[in-house]
Amino acid sequence: ITEAGFGSDLGAGKFLDIKCPTAGIAPSCIVLVATVRALKYNGGVPKDKVAEPNLAALEKGIVNLAAHLANMQKYGVPVVVAINRFPQDTQEELDYIAAYCKGRGADFALSEVFAKGAEGGVELAQKVVEAVAKPSAFRSIVAGCGSIRERLETIAKTIYGAREVIYTPAAEKALRDILALDPAMDGKPVCVAKTQYSLSDDPAKLGRPTDFAITVRDIRLSNGAGFVVALTGDIMTMPGLPKVPAAQGIDVDEKGDIWGLF
């Protein structure tokens, strides 16, 4: 079981297109996790209003879930949509999502582990057990791509829904420098660093953006890890930290004892 964080266009994509082919493994099922409030946010509701019932916004924002679902189904593996239920979610909203998913060939389950503990995860677990028993034919979407550019374009157009990929002069130079080291580098997998808030490289473009370009501002070689990193937007490759990282509460006294560890 692998938890591939961020949106499915990022975490799941890297697991399915980099790790699985490299390790020679294939998933038996994909669990796509969403929340009612996030879908309403994608439907235009301000963050401080997402807990309020709003079926109209849900109907507008569900195109985001539809895009992620369609993307995961391209890998040839059964998909289960799991909704992390919040107390404010209405039955009408949950029923709408369930019907929407089933109409698109995906199983649906509620996850209520936070409120009910292990009991709240039984429904989802049962759906996953049923899904892994179904036939599947996993295939990476970049299988057969012969170059870094081709892999980037396939990911951008097939998963993000982009119109094209634009390279800045810095990215063009970086790619030339990488290939100058060894032309075989063109066979490296591509790890895209992109915002998790949008299918595009612009976090303000919610829902299901269309007719947009993905701009690659730089390309870096992570040769030890075995891939190249394509940087888009202003995303950082460092792990996300809170405004006050836990490290600020850690200290070492004059005796060499460490304080503030969890």
Please give the residue ranges for each predicted region.
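P-loop NTP-binding site
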Residues: I1-V81, R85-E93, A99-F262
